[in-house]
């Protein structure tokens, strides 16, 4: 399938953003560990969350999580402490995404996990049973989902969990989100040092829980505002929380540098806000930023900057190599189609010094990566008739994206 997109001349729209995928997935695992029958309210209906919902209900031995990386990591830990034997598998791409660090850590804690194929990669055969827990060290520069997976089962371990993170800690806001949610459900879990987290052996308590909207999803609307030629453009986003624990709420700061002003309208404490985005003049010639804490925003900001003719040097991108695709190479390849030549430095850095090439009319390839489609679609404001391959991939995190774009006046 190919969508051909064109952007509107004027934007004045109100969008109900999807529930947070990150919060939904954590809440489901915690509620299951609490043996609660309560389903979190305002739960995400994206593919990744649906996979976890089905996995927690299934009686089948084989659990296919498809392309859901979060589900693979969280369920590997969850199934390790639940009685029963399961095979956890996924797509061909999922079988290429390393999971050895998490498996080694779970085995160290006493888990019974075997590789069904290549060592260090899914599928996994897991025989669940009670684990002793205790002290463990793992690198801090691995996917934060490995760390969150271990933390989530910490209260279920006989000795609790003391987790020391060596090396630089990446995506720390996601770790903090996990700890905050664990405490919301009665766990005793916190940092005891700059590199050490302690989780007590105290069971979760099931409770009613509301899922706020997704700050990562808001980033595509910030991009739309930044790329719109309409100086009077207005976008209102419903469901976001001011002071959110979502690490990607930093998007409001990043885009303030790119000329987008964020205003909150709060009706009552603890109630989701209406966030209004306005444009002001951006005079920034170059942007430098470290995405270590918010790598999922990188594609959005990269695509925005080149289309605003803002040079950049971005760091903290190492985890982009092992996402749904190699996002660094995918960005370089697809932006070249639009006439921009990017350079990568090692596995961690991406820069654009203003170099251009002859653009082509080739459709944008999405590489089975939802964030490629999500980040490139707003370019239709600058390039009418932009074509995007396999647009259905957005269902992984933002199922109503195309409908919401049409609400805002895009044609497809």
Where are these regions (language model features)?
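Short, structured segments at the rim of ligand-binding sites
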Residues: 1-412
